[in-house]
Amino acid sequence: MAFEGLSEKLNNVFKKLKSRGKLTESDVKEAMREVRLALLEADVSYKVVKDFVKSVTERAVGEEVLASLTPAQQVIKIVNEELVSLMGNSNARINMASKPPTVIMMCGLQGSGKTTHAAKLAKLLKKEGHRPLLAACDIYRPAAINQLQVVGGKADVKVFEMGQTDPVVIAKKALAYAKDYGHDILIIDTAGRLHIDEALMDELVNIKKETNPDEIMLVVDAMTGQDAVNVAKAFDDAVGITGVLMSKLDSDTRGGAATGFFRFLRYFWVGNVITHSCYKTPSKTAVAFEVIREKAAVTFSFFP
């Protein structure tokens, strides 16, 4: 599970601090050097780590902290608070249109799990009482339409497809179909690429213009580490993403890349089976508790 390695290393640092009793400024700075290394090894970006350690150090070396009866606990508390601040604001709820259908455009690189996550999201929304429609707008990848039909079938959600027609036309027709047949949510599965290119972005921009999506969800592979942050930035610059769905996060024990776009993070699923996978919504406080288990009075899950 994500953050396991980071959690273990940070807690080792805190155990050392607690064993010393009274702390000096030198003790705190040495601990922060170890924290810095642990964060970098967990795939947190260099700039984020630098700013984080600077903020913690400035607060932790103050006379009030070092002179307290429990200085180590004070330092742990400061690290926890700075972690929560680092995560920023996250809104896990879908922005629903005031007048249906709500349009959700899915985007991402090929192999990120975009099509599967489109079906998982559709199943989740159907379970919540909605009537979603999946639109097959990936006409390039072999068997992409068939894959969406298969996963859509497992989610018990209808799939709108027009074969190898222009994806922009398909998206526009799917929106009209959703309106005509009472689907209150349209999820558009767009084409991915092996890497970001101009043609991919132009197509997404044109689909966005035609459908005016309420949400633009980027699916990123957590296993790609900091590359996931770079991918998120590229898509955000091009089309303005409103949310991120992370795939394979339960396979990565580092998890630090998530800090780069936590404010966008909406859902994370455990397992690949459409009918049995478990979804989670993000909580920045829960992440901080998971990373710093020393401070937690009870056991917290990564995403409660």
Q: PLM ranges: what are they?
A:
Residues 6-137, 144-164, 170-180, 184-190:
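Primarily NTPase-proximal linker/entry elements flanking Walker-type ATP/GTP-binding cores
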Residues 80-93, 181-187, 193-195, 253, ...:
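C-terminal-of-GTPase-core extension/linker across diverse P-loop GTPases
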Residues 142-145, 196-197:
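Conserved D-loop-proximal element of ABC-family nucleotide-binding domains
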Residues 298-299:
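Short linear/disordered segments characteristic of secreted peptide precursors
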